[in-house]
Amino acid sequence: MIHPEQVADMLRPTTSTTSSHVPGPVPTVVPTPTEYQTLGETGHRTLWVTFALMVLSSGIFALLSWNVPTSKRLFHVITTLITVVASLSYFAMATGHATTFNCDTAWDHHKHVPDTSHQVCRQVFWGRYVDWALTTPLLLLELCLLAGVDGAHTLMAIVADVIMVLCGLFAALGEGGNTAQKWGWYTIGCFSYLFVIWHVALHGSRTVTAKGRGVSRLFTGLAVFALLLWTAYPIIWGIAGGARRTNVDTEILIYTVLDLLAKPVFGFWLLLSHRAMPETNIDLPGYWSHGLATEGRIRIGEED
């Protein structure tokens, strides 16, 4: 027989001594917004200042040719065209017309949640490559004319130079995450640059000796100066545009210094030395100097 108090104890609710684990909330991850690497105020001002310096240099180069006969203005014309093209390029970049963005995927690593990714978009000034594709062949042409390099080697040097610049453009605008593509174009461009050195430096140093010691020394100085500067361009690209180790403003400042040295400074050096050395003159009569005004005239009284 069960005592009534035992029945009451049996009917009372009992509390469990074991506790169940309640899972906590899952950590949330806020997606990282797209990161834009663009030029700042320093880079913008640098582009405008360089544009003004290129325009000023173009005007001075044109004035230097004022008293030079048309038949002997070849170096003046080429040098002026180089800085004119550079002026247009820097105006386009300063106004934001010759620029685009190249995006790459960056991964963010987390401890307790899956990794996430976000886009890193870097500003690329493609107008710079248009400038180089037009002006560097003209610079090579000046060096080859000064040294007396034959047309075949001059053409090969110019073609290799254009390939080098285009490879740099393809690498800069290629798919950001495709490392093989980017550095593949970069490697091809570097090999093309070796061909430029081969045709200009080696063949130029051989042919310029026939023009005398003064011209030989001038060519050697200009060629070493130009090729050292051009060697710096792919190095800077690999650090800035390729590996993205510098900001856009720093990239602009470095390229600006190189462009000013490779174009206005090189041009002043060449033209002032050219004026002091008559043996560097290249006389171009005929169509270059007089056009077609004297062509096709009928001379009466002369035998055929």
Curated annotation (Swiss-Prot):
The modification N6-(retinylidene)lysine is found at residue 263. Belongs to the archaeal/bacterial/fungal opsin family. SMART domains: Bac_rhodopsin (SM01021). PROSITE patterns: BACTERIAL_OPSIN_1, BACTERIAL_OPSIN_RET. It comes from Neurospora crassa (strain ATCC 24698 / 74-OR23-1A / CBS 708.71 / DSM 1257 / FGSC 987). The keyword Ribosomal protein does not apply. The keyword Metal-binding does not apply. Residues 1-45 are extracellular. The chain crosses the membrane at residues 46-66, 74-94, 129-149, 154-174, 183-203, 219-239, 252-272. Residues 273-304 are cytoplasmic. Keywords: Chromophore, Membrane, Photoreceptor protein, Receptor, Retinal protein, Schiff base, Sensory transduction, Transmembrane, Transmembrane helix. This is Opsin-1. It is found in: Membrane. Binds all-trans retinal via a protonated Schiff base linkage. It is a multi-pass membrane protein. One of its GO terms (cellular component) is plasma membrane. GO terms for molecular function: all-trans retinal binding; monoatomic ion channel activity; photoreceptor activity.
